[in-house]
Amino acid sequence: MLKALNLLSLYTKDVEASVSFYKELGFELVNNDGSVAEVKLGDVRLQFIAQETADKQDESFQKDAFGEPKGTGVYIYIEVDDANAYYKQLKEVGITPSTKPRDWPWEQREFVVRDPDRYKLVFYEKLS
């Protein structure tokens, strides 16, 4: 029986840049040894793995780290209280969202931000 989804591992070119970016968004740093770091928001953790560590792994890890575009077709959804206010807050600290807040038929207001490795984060507010 499934219990919970609590960790996403993402290969990154620069662990420190990813940690800094996600801390700016409001994530909490869990640990950072320089080649692997974790941040968390609520019960979900994001793990950043330096691409160069894949050189020390088997071929399947190397393919994941280097061979394919990062985040293609994947959107990581993060709920916020007020999408417009959070959009403005990010712009004020120098983070440029990819899209402006938009209302969708599924009754959410959403906007997208790309992280330093181009992973797509969707910040959304429930409208109903």
Could you tell me what each predicted segment is?
Residues D14-E28:
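Amphipathic alpha-helical segments
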Residues M1-N6, E28-I78, Y87-R114, E125-S128:
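Vicinal oxygen chelate
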Residues S9:
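Polyanion-binding surface elements
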Residues K120-F123:
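Short glycine-/small-residue motifs
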Residues S18-Y22, L90, R118:
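Conserved active-site tyrosine of GNAT-family acetyltransferases
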Residues A17, A83-Y87:
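Short, conserved charged micro-motifs
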Residues T12, Y77-V80:
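Short, solvent-exposed loop/helix junctions and linker helices
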